[in-house]
Amino acid sequence: MIQQTLCLIKPDATQRNLIGKILSHLEEAGLTIKALKKVQLNQEQAEGFYAEHQGKEFFAPLVEFMISAPIVAVVLEGENAISHYRELMGATNPEQRKAGTIRALYAISGRENSVHGSDSEQSAKREIAYFFTPNEIL
């Protein structure tokens, strides 16, 4: 099934000029870029995007990290794009990352893990709509 999912290239990766490498990794794996924009989130935007985590101990540090530098929001499309992209991303936990995944290659830590990806169809729809209007997705 053809799906769309959201990829965020996080501040740790944008600051280290890894945008092109990450996008190449995704395209070489068969995913198509349908929309892309570089964004500097403010506190309110970051809190809104991660609202489901409000009240958790990692919420405030995550928001601080996500507003520390620009991010790149990308809509990816492909066969089973959500699960395919999550496999390409690799695990959040550094000890569980498989070699060759984006996080194994580029992540600095559990929080500074270079990329975010939608975890379900419902999340993908909500997250894509957070960053893109329908006419921006080509």
From Swiss-Prot:
Cofactor requirements of the protein: Mg(2+)
InterPro entries in UniProt: NDK-like_dom, NDK-like_dom_sf, Nucleoside_diP_kinase, Nucleoside_diP_kinase_AS
Recorded coiled-coil stretches: none
Binding site residues for ATP: 10, 58, 86, 92, 103, 113
SS bond list: none
GO molecular function, one term: nucleoside diphosphate kinase activity
Subcellular location: Cytoplasm
Keywords from the UniProt entry: ATP-binding, Cytoplasm, Kinase, Magnesium, Metal-binding, Nucleotide metabolism, Nucleotide-binding, Phosphoprotein, Transferase
Active-site residues, Swiss-Prot/TrEMBL: 116
Gene Ontology BP terms: CTP biosynthetic process; GTP biosynthetic process; UTP biosynthetic process
Primary location group: cytoplasm
EC number: 2.7.4.6
A Pfam family it matches: NDK
Gene Ontology cellular-component terms listed: cytoplasm
Catalyzed chemical reaction(s): a 2'-deoxyribonucleoside 5'-diphosphate + ATP = a 2'-deoxyribonucleoside 5'-triphosphate + ADP; a ribonucleoside 5'-diphosphate + ATP = a ribonucleoside 5'-triphosphate + ADP
Enzyme class: transferase
Biological role: Major role in the synthesis of nucleoside triphosphates other than ATP. The ATP gamma phosphate is transferred to the NDP beta phosphate via a ping-pong mechanism, using a phosphorylated active-site intermediate.
Family: Belongs to the NDK family.
HAMAP family: NDP_kinase
Subunit structure: Homotetramer.
Name of the protein in its database record: Nucleoside diphosphate kinase
Organism: Actinobacillus pleuropneumoniae serotype 3 (strain JL03)
